[in-house]
Curated annotation (Swiss-Prot):
Signal peptide: none annotated. Residues 2-63 form the HTH asnC-type domain. Gene3D superfamilies: 3.30.70.920, Winged helix-like DNA-binding domain superfamily/Winged helix DNA-binding domain (1.10.10.10). This is HTH-type transcriptional regulator LrpA. SMART domains: HTH_ASNC (SM00344). GO terms for molecular function: sequence-specific DNA binding. Residues 21-40 bind DNA. InterPro entries: AsnC-type_HTH_dom, Dimeric_a/b-barrel, Tscrpt_reg_AsnC-like, Tscrpt_reg_AsnC/Lrp_C, WH-like_DNA-bd_sf, WH_DNA-bd_sf. Keywords: DNA-binding, Repressor, Transcription, Transcription regulation. GO terms for cellular component: cytosol. The keyword Chloroplast does not apply.
């Protein structure tokens, strides 16, 4: 079980996972060693699974951010999954979902032409509905 201080630590690390233990401790009113001990405990208990960065895909040349609802009418999804594994340049996440569709695919593309080619290739394995991200 976690307490209010642990919740504050998680909140601060969610905002900036690069905080030093000293700065984090100041924000939650603990010493750096006490803060580090709590962070280690959160990691050991599996509450913190890792620290990550947020990549600016536009600066890397991927100006199109899209979500695709994937619809597969066949029982076997392996051809679709095999195709997705070959598309790691464009696929950010592939979530198996319930509700509308079988999968929710998050992708990035450098141009409409590349998106169009991806959709043509995808259509050999599944039907889809595309939503383009306008803003965050």
């Amino acid at each position: 079980m976690i307490d209010e201080i642990d919740k504050k630590i998680l909140d601060e690390l969610s905002k900036n996972s690069r905080l030093t233990m000293k700065k984090l401790g100041e924000k939650v009113h603990l010493t750096a060693p006490a803060t580090a001990s709590r962070v280690v405990k959160l990691i050991d208990n599996g509450i913190i699974k890792g620290c990550s960065i947020e990549v600016n895909q536009v600066k890397l040349g991927f100006s199109i951010h899209a979500f695709l609802n994937i619809y597969i009418e066949k029982i076997h999804h392996q051809p679709y999954l095999a195709f997705i594994e070959t598309q790691d340049n464009y696929v950010i996440n592939n979530y198996k979902v319930s509700g509308d569709g079988c999968y929710l695919l998050e992708c990035k593309f450098p141009s409409n032409e590349v998106l169009d080619q991806f959709l043509n290739d995808l259509n050999k394995h599944a039907n889809y509905k595309v939503s383009i991200v306008i803003g965050k």
